[in-house]
Each structure stands twice: as structure tokens, then as C-alpha cells.
């Protein structure tokens, strides 16, 4: 079944009604079960952005300014009511509250994830984007701490394809479309205990940096 969440697929009116219900279900899961706020996001349509700005520099990959955020902890009824006002919107997760993001190339992220799992380290969710990025959910504060952490680990001078996302940024939530390129997917889905309290960046950073260096 296709989802109109994020403009993944446009179907008939009956399917759109079902997909709107599916959209609010995802929102309710993210807000109620995992403790994340959700913002309605724009979607890409035939090379343009649903925000209406013909010069939009991030079509289908940014929050809708006029749409209200669904707060963390919102009930299914609140989520359904909020999402009924933004049919077809994608789901955007605000970074810097419940989590920050360490982002690397997908190939490096997949290698690092295998190693981290073998080491038995605590891990939060990991998403992969259609443009080949892996996003590791880590404790808030990672974006501010990243330069110092890399320095302490001896990676500050290495040319690494690694960046941190923090307050003021958003990521597209699975299974929404990202900029018309395809859906974002879970490489490691949210789980109780780590979704709302992901591990500190320092536990993952050394392995991620090493994997990036090898790429």
C-alpha cells in the first residue's frame, strides 16, 4: 500500500483517506510512543515544492512554516486532528530536543552499525535517506560537542564525511519522501529505552569516524 505521507504516492480519494489515517497513525506513534515532536513538512511535486515558493532551495525537505507542530506525548486523537489540517504533508522531526544526529555516508554507516552491534554498545535509531546518508540518533548536545570530541579522539585533522545536526534543524521521518528522491527508511528502528534516551555521541563517534576514514 502506498502512502501519501510526504507525497510518496498519489492515489484515488478512497486510498487518500486511508493514507491520511495511516499518516496520523505514524504521527501518533512518534509523539506518543517514542516521545518525539513532529512538524508537518513540505513535499516535492514534479520538481517544485508544495510550499509554493518557486525559488525554494529545499523542495520537499523542510517544515511548513504555517503548520502547527504536534508536541511530544500527543494522544492519537490530537495527532489525528492536527494531521487532518495538513493532508499529504511529510513528517519532520525537530533535532536538538530528544536527540541530535550524527550523519555519515550510508556505506560508512552500515559498516559502523555492524561493528557497534558486535561490540554490544547501546544504540539509538538509525535512518537512511534516499540520497545515501545514514543518520544516527544520539543524545542532545552532540552538535555542540562534536569538535571537542573529535579533537580528543585524534580525528580533528582527518577529512571525514561526518557531521552533526542539532537545534534548529529537522530531519525527514520514515517512511516519508525526501525531496522527491524516495522514502527515508529505518536501518535500525526505534525501540523502547533508546528512542527517547539515545546514547551519548562519544560512544559511537570513534567507530563512525574510523568507518568514514576507510571509505
Predicted feature residues:
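Signature for HUH/AEP ssDNA processing cores
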Residues: 2-131, 141, 192-215
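DNA replication initiation modules
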Residues: 141-215
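Catalytic core of tubulin tyrosine ligase-like
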Residues: 136
Amino acid at each position: 500500500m502506498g502512502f501519501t505521507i510526504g507525497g510518496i504516492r498519489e492515489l484515488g480519494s478512497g486510498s487518500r483517506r486511508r493514507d491520511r489515517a495511516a499518516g496520523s497513525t505514524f504521527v501518533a506513534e512518534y509523539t506518543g510512543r517514542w516521545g518525539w515532536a513532529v512538524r508537518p513538512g513540505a513535499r516535492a511535486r514534479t520538481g517544485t515544492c508544495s510550499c509554493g515558493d518557486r525559488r525554494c532551495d529545499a523542495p520537499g525537505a523542510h517544515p511548513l512554516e504555517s503548520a502547527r507542530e504536534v508536541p511530544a506525548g500527543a494522544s492519537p486523537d490530537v495527532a489525528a486532528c492536527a494531521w487532518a489540517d495538513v493532508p499529504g504533508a511529510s513528517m519532520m522531526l525537530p533535532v536538538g530536543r530528544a536527540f541530535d544526529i550524527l550523519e555519515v555516508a550510508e556505506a560508512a554507516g552500515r559498516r559502523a552499525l555492524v561493528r557497534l552491534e558486535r561490540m554490544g554498545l547501546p544504540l539509538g535509531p538509525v535512518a537512511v535517506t534516499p540520497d545515501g546518508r545514514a543518520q544516527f540518533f544520539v543524545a542532545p548536545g552532540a552538535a555542540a560537542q562534536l569538535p571537542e570530541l573529535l579533537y580528543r579522539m585524534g580525528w580533528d585533522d582527518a577529512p571525514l564525511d561526518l557531521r552533526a545536526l542539532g537545534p534548529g534543524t529537522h530531519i525527514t521521518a520514515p517512511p516519508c519522501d525526501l525531496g522527491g528522491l524516495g522514502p527515508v527508511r529505518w536501518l535500525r528502528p526505534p525501540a523502547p529505552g533508546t528512542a527517547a534516551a539515545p546514547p551519548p555521541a562519544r560512544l559511537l563517534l570513534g567507530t563512525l569516524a574510523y568507518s568514514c576514514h576507510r571509505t
